[in-house]
Amino acid sequence: MASSGRTGTDDIVSGIMGKWATAFGSLDAGALASLYSTNAFFFGSNPSLYRGHDGVQAYFDALPRWRAPTVKFTDVRTAHAAPDLINVAGTASFVVEEGAQPLVVKITWVIVREDGDWKIVSHHVSSKTPLI
């Protein structure tokens, strides 16, 4: 049987991304916040730093109430950096209104095992357009 090259780390990250995409699709700020560590640092689409569950929930609660937002994660790379730590990098393409051009960003997460579950402890997005 040929190996797909997929690892347990990839499965963990894929599971979190699936939950994240589902919660984003309904703009469920509580469900999104539940995916983050109590010690999370979060840089989203604005310049503010949000911290912990409350900060992440506040960020998502403040977003416009789009009817059917979607996100697609591509070019995902993972590294099991330590027994309880996973590093993630990829691309996230957000479509927030039907017919609109997607907002495509680079995304990095650091995922940590917290209380027996995997949680995002660091979230950062940045422009795919070169700044320099």
Question: What residues fall within each predicted segment?
Answer:
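A beta-strand edge to alpha-helix "cap/lid" segment located at domain peripheries
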Residues: M1-A31, F41-I132
